[in-house]
């Protein structure tokens, strides 16, 4: 089940991100999230803005993601390609799972597809697992974007 995250969920959300960071580091991608991303304050803001969601099964949180309708300034500039549409879109950020259940990513993405016909997502070039999952779920690679710290990300979009 997908639902909005609540402040009471924060310990479980932090645990999911800790597991995801460890998995990323062990699978050739230690720098995308480092040891502390996303920071707790960012997650609290996402919860307050009602843009952080959790995937639960039997009331246990196994996945988490931010879903943000509207323009994301990170995607204003793209190089080595272009967006396939200038239509309004929603963005998926910080998607992660605890690795205990299969299909969490697809379930979260399908929820987002139900909310918006045009989605954007990005990941680090070394995040092979995420790149595979993104493309497997119907997203098309569009080019390279740069996040707040100046590092590059591979950007994808989905059009219904």
Predicted segments, located by residue:
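Conserved acetyl-CoA-binding loop-helix of GNAT-fold acetyltransferases
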Residues: 97-114, 132-136
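Conserved beta-hairpin
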Residues: 49-66
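Conserved GNAT acetyl-CoA-binding A-motif
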Residues: 91, 114-126
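A short beta-loop-alpha structural element at the N-terminal edge
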Residues: 1-15
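A short helix-loop-beta-strand connector motif used in the catalytic cores of GNAT acetyltransferases and
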Residues: 41-54, 71-73
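Conserved acyl-donor/pantetheine-binding loop and adjacent beta-alpha core of acyl/acetyltransferases
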Residues: 66-100
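Conserved GNAT-fold acetyl-CoA-binding loop/helix
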Residues: 21-41
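Conserved active-site alpha-helix within GNAT-family acetyltransferase domains
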Residues: 106, 126-143, 148-151
């Amino acid at each position: 089940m997908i639902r909005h995250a609540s402040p009471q969920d924060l310990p479980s959300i932090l645990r999911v991100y800790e597991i995801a960071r460890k998995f990323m580091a062990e699978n050739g991608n230690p720098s995308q999230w480092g040891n502390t991303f996303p920071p707790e304050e960012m997650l609290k803001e996402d919860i307050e803005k009602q843009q952080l969601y959790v995937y639960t099964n039997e009331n246990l949180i196994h996945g988490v993601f931010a879903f943000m309708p509207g323009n994301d300034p990170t995607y204003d500039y793209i190089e080595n390609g272009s967006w396939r549409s200038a239509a309004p879109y929603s963005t998926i950020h910080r998607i992660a799972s605890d690795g205990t259940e299969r299909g969490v990513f697809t379930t979260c993405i399908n929820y987002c597809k139900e909310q918006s016909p045009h989605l954007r997502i990005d990941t680090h070039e070394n995040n092979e697992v995420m790149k595979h999952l993104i493309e497997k779920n119907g997203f098309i690679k569009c080019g390279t974007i740069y996040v707040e710290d100046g590092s590059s990300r591979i950007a994808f979009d989905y059009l219904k």
